[in-house]
UniProtKB/Swiss-Prot annotation:
Region (2-C-methyl-D-erythritol 4-phosphate cytidylyltransferase) location: 1-246
Residues annotated to bind a divalent metal cation: D253, H255, H287
Species of the source: Rhizobium johnstonii (strain DSM 114642 / LMG 32736 / 3841)
GO molecular function, one term: 2-C-methyl-D-erythritol 2,4-cyclodiphosphate synthase activity
Record's keyword terms, sorted: Isoprene biosynthesis, Lyase, Metal-binding, Multifunctional enzyme, Nucleotidyltransferase, Transferase
Protein family membership: In the N-terminal section; belongs to the IspD/TarI cytidylyltransferase family. IspD subfamily.
Name by which UniProt lists this protein: Bifunctional enzyme IspD/IspF
EC number of this enzyme: 2.7.7.60, 4.6.1.12
Region (2-C-methyl-D-erythritol 2,4-cyclodiphosphate synthase): 247-405
Annotated site (Positions MEP for the nucleophilic attack): R167, K224
Organism classification: Bacteria, Pseudomonadati, Pseudomonadota, Alphaproteobacteria, Hyphomicrobiales
Length: 405
């Protein structure tokens, strides 16, 4: 059933399809391609940030694979959003995943919906505004597309060219594909009920039901990241598009050693015959790194945010402090590029625990473990560290803030 043309500015729900496995992009320890890092952030974060800052977006639902809960949670640490963002699990096909997202939005107060591939991070607000104008003018289905410019050949199974195909009236479809909400929900429900699962995009489902699809001008940059080389080119593109605002922050901390059963360093507990004395868990490494992160944006130091005189922080895990500092950095437009911690202690030995410490830093900061460094040295029995009266830590954080085009 077709809706009447909209008379009010659109209220848009956003469905971001992110349940694919991305097998053509090859395997990676970062997971499927929507979670690969480009420009210091996962692909899906760049996509989300574009929608989060678009004023017509009122609800965002990300359709993820059931196995990707942890990957999305890790990526989500990069995101500061005033627009509600929820997740639902997708199905075995893109079509099933889109329907899951649409069903989630069914009870939301939205007039229209934009359905977008998570691995298309390079769309802009000008494109979204063109789509909104077309929807607001009464279009039931809007497809961003660009004219085909390559010469097209049809070949047989052996790879022999049979004919050259005319490019006239041919367009390459993009996303976000956008619709009056009830129209596309009904279309997807009918497709599911009929057993049809061979549609390659949402506009095809609208066409199947005879719903007119209006083309608006797409952009050449709005490409889908499909293979491994696409990811590398996207990373290069982002790196080259901005004049970077690179900042380095340093932090230093020291805690006294007293009799005990172990120390916590970089979030890892190490059995020992002493412990670190402090108001919180006394993780000297995380305290130094917290100060280093705060220094990159002039946000004071750990004592300003978590005063030792405040009883609520007594015995607190220092993970709270480091994640708070990382969140402030991201709120101010920063991307954490590197974290380096040097521990100065006679004992315990750090070497056997270094990889576990790096893994903790990677988890707390939401960055690749290769960007996390932990080193240790002794003080050659000199001074309070040499006398095993305390442990010191020096930390350096490198953060890139949003530059200028």
């Amino acid at each position: 059933m077709l809706q009447m043309p909209s008379k009010q500015p659109i209220s848009a729900g956003i469905v971001i399809v992110a349940a694919g496995r991305g097998e053509r992009a090859g395997s990676s320890k970062e997971g499927p391609k929507q979670y690969r890092m480009i420009g210091g952030k996962p692909v899906i974060v760049h996509t989300l940030e574009n929608f989060m800052t678009w004023e017509a977006a009122t609800e965002i639902v990300v359709v993820i694979h059931p196995d990707d809960e942890a990957l999305f949670a890790r990526a989500f640490r990069h995101i500061i959003s005033a627009t509600p963002i929820e997740t639902v699990h997708g199905g075995a096909t893109r079509q099933q995943s889109v329907l899951a997202g649409l069903r989630y939005l069914k009870d939301k107060q939205i007039s229209h919906v934009l359905i977008h591939d998570a691995v298309r991070p390079f769309f802009d607000h000008a494109l979204l505004d063109r789509i909104a104008e077309s929807l607001d003018a009464g279009a039931q289905a809007v497809l961003p597309a660009i004219p085909v410019t390559d010469t097209l050949k049809r070949a047989d199974n052996a790879g022999t060219v049979l004919t050259t195909v005319s490019r006239e009236h041919l367009y390459a479809a993009q996303t976000p594909q956008s619709f009056a909400f009830e129209t596309i929900l009904e279309a997807h429900e009918k497709a599911a009920a009929s057993g049809r699962s061979d549609f390659t995009d949402d506009a095809s489902i609208a066409e199947w039901l005879g719903i007119p699809v209006t083309i608006v001008e797409g952009t050449a940059d709005n490409v889908k990241l499909t293979v491994k080389d696409d990811i590398a080119m996207a990373d290069d593109k982002l790196s080259a598009s901005l004049l970077p605002d690179v900042r380095t922050g340093n932090g230093y901390d020291v805690h006294q050693l007293v009799a005990g059963d172990g120390v916590t360093l970089c979030g890892v507990f190490i059995p020992h015959d002493q412990k670190l004395k402090g108001h919180s868990d006394a993780d000297v490494a995380l305290h130094a790194l917290t100060d280093a992160l705060l220094a990159t944006c002039g946000a004071g130091d750990i004592g300003d945010h978590f005063p030792p005189s405040d009883p609520q922080w007594k015995g607190a895990a220092s993970r709270i402090f480091i994640e708070h500092a990382a969140r402030i950095v991201r709120e101010r437009g920063g991307t954490i590029m590197n974290a380096d911690v040097s521990l100065i202690a006679e004992a315990p030995k750090v070497g056997p625990h270094r990889d576990a410490m790096r893994a903790k830093l990677s988890d707390y900061l939401g960055i690749d473990i290769e960007r996390c460094s932990v080193k240790a040295t002794t003080n050659e029995t000199i001074g309070f560290v040499g006398r095993r009266e305390g442990i010191a830590a020096i930390a350096t954080a490198t953060v890139v803030y949003r530059g200028r085009k």
